[in-house]
Amino acid sequence: MVMLDVLSNALMSVKNAESRGDRQVIIWPSSKLIGNVLRVMQRYGYVGEFEYVYDGRGGKYVVQLLGRINDIGAIKPRFHVKVDELQKWEEKYLPARQVGILILTTSKGVVSHLEARENRVGGILVAYVY
């Protein structure tokens, strides 16, 4: 099977495990971007602890699920967003005000849309979670 987008594959693995009611999911293959996205999701309480396990084939993440994710997905194509345009993208991808987060890659690292607005930085949209 050809993996074209490892982030999208990882987020779909989390979504499928959540819908089955699993308490943990193994994400393979892994990347630094996946680790940073998981860190943002952990900061907002969507996933529990996670750890990187190196297995000699690129590594994998073992993620503890909390059952708090209703929907999650990668945003494709990856849109470049200015800080003033974040409201428009919130309305497009999130179900209501103050519900969920958009995840962006910025010059300050991988952050949520709330942190990007606070730091006044734009970036590239990569995912949404609520």
Swiss-Prot record:
Record flagged with keyword Transmembrane helix: no
The keyword ATP-binding is assigned to this record: no
Annotated Gene3D superfamilies: 3.30.1370.30, 3.30.1490.10
UniProt GO cellular component terms: ribonucleoprotein complex; ribosome
Domain of life, per lineage: Archaea
GO biological process, one term: translation
Keyword terms of this UniProt record: Ribonucleoprotein, Ribosomal protein, RNA-binding, rRNA-binding
GO molecular function, one term: rRNA binding
Family: Belongs to the universal ribosomal protein uS8 family.
Subunit note: Part of the 30S ribosomal subunit.
PANTHER family for this protein: 40S RIBOSOMAL PROTEIN S15A (PTHR11758)
The protein's name: Small ribosomal subunit protein uS8
Species of origin: Caldivirga maquilingensis (strain ATCC 700844 / DSM 13496 / JCM 10307 / IC-167)
The organism's taxonomic lineage, starting at the top: Archaea, Thermoproteota, Thermoprotei, Thermoproteales, Thermoproteaceae
Gene name linked to the record: rps8
